[in-house]
């Protein structure tokens, strides 16, 4: 993904304030609530029967933290996202058979969660930079599908 120096700085500055545990759980939880068909990949997580059940589910929170940890790794390697996410792409494609569109959906949900958490600090300029990043990560995760 190509970011200008200013965009990289904006992403790094905001990301340094992100609570990965909370934001990860909220982002994955919202994905499962807003796009309920994505729940089929998480049937082993137990109670997903209502928005409250999803958002309070400790397995959703734990996996969201794991997902955002991988996203953080990607932020450290913006010039090599395909390489950074190669193993995860293979896992999600070959073993888990996740629809690659879900990566784009999760990226957009993450942007919504960041906007909710950071309010005025999440300016249109910062959002534009994050949209590039989440699109790049989604493309990298979908790489093995092509």
From Swiss-Prot:
Residues 2-146 form the Globin domain. Pfam families: Globin (PF00042). One of its GO terms (cellular component) is blood microparticle. Heterotetramer of two delta chains and two alpha chains. Heme b binds at residues 63, 92. Transmembrane segments: none annotated. The modification Phosphoserine is found at residue 50. GO terms for biological process: hydrogen peroxide catabolic process. SUPFAM superfamilies: Globin-like (SSF46458). Belongs to the globin family. It comes from Saguinus mystax. InterPro entries: Globin, Globin-like_sf, Globin/Proto, Hemoglobin_b, Hemoglobin_oxygen_transport. It comes from the Eukaryota. Keywords: Heme, Iron, Metal-binding, Oxygen transport, Phosphoprotein, Transport. Coiled coil: none annotated. This is Hemoglobin subunit delta. Red blood cells. GO terms for molecular function: haptoglobin binding; heme binding; hemoglobin alpha binding; metal ion binding; organic acid binding; oxygen binding; oxygen carrier activity; peroxidase activity. The gene is HBD.
